[in-house]
């Protein structure tokens, strides 16, 4: 089984949290709402990976004013590829508290949509299992 270290930013702006809706045809949680994030590449430093993933998935214009390590956990997940193949992966999640100066997001092809959501409204979204655990641990659900 392959192992991946995943960096996940929990991005907040003026009391709203950024959620991204995963593309329906790929990923570990197709069609569900999630935090952005992705895998650390070989010899890449953790914060470099976090900033790269944010740029790739959310665009160059989103400005983070605060990044702090918050929590970690592990899990085993099944990833579905665009061609329908599936792979079981051991995931190590490194979760960061982030604050953004703006809400200027441009999503890539990994996502179908995004939303800035008030804490009290997070429960109304079809959150994937990993995001639900993260937001519960944070006291937001």
Swiss-Prot record:
Keyword Cell membrane: no
Residue ranges of every copy of the Nudix hydrolase domain listed in the record: 1-141
Sorted UniProt keywords: Hydrolase, Magnesium
Entry annotated with the keyword Magnesium: yes
EC number annotated for this UniProt entry: 3.6.1.9, 3.6.1.12, 3.6.1.-, 3.6.1.23
GO molecular function: dCTP diphosphatase activity; dTTP diphosphatase activity; dUTP diphosphatase activity; magnesium ion binding
Entry's family note: Belongs to the Nudix hydrolase family. NudI subfamily.
SUPFAM superfamilies found in the cross-reference section: Nudix (SSF55811)
Protein name as it appears in the record: Nucleoside triphosphatase NudI
General function of this protein: Catalyzes the hydrolysis of nucleoside triphosphates, with a preference for pyrimidine deoxynucleoside triphosphates (dUTP, dTTP and dCTP).
Catalytic activity reported: a ribonucleoside 5'-triphosphate + H2O = a ribonucleoside 5'-phosphate + diphosphate + H(+); a 2'-deoxyribonucleoside 5'-triphosphate + H2O = a 2'-deoxyribonucleoside 5'-phosphate + diphosphate + H(+); dUTP + H2O = dUMP + diphosphate + H(+); dTTP + H2O = dTMP + diphosphate + H(+)
Matches recorded under PROSITE patterns: NUDIX (PS51462), NUDIX_BOX (PS00893)
Assembly with partners or alone: Monomer.
């Amino acid at each position: 089984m392959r192992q991946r270290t995943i960096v996940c930013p929990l991005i907040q702006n003026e009391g709203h949290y950024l959620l991204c809706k995963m593309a329906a045809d790929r990923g570990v949680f197709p069609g569900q709402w999630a935090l952005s994030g992705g895998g650390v590449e070989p010899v890449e430093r953790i914060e470099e990976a976090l900033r790269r993933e944010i740029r790739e998935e959310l665009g160059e214009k989103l400005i983070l004013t605060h990044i702090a390590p918050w929590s970690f956990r592990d899990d085993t997940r099944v990833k579905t590829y665009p061609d329908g193949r599936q792979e079981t992966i051991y995931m190590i999640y490194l979760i960061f508290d982030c604050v953004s100066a703006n809400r200027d997001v441009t999503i890539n092809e990994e996502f179908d949509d995004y939303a800035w959501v008030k804490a009290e409204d997070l429960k109304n979204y079809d959150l994937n299992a990993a995001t639900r655990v993260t937001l519960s641990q944070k006291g937001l659900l």
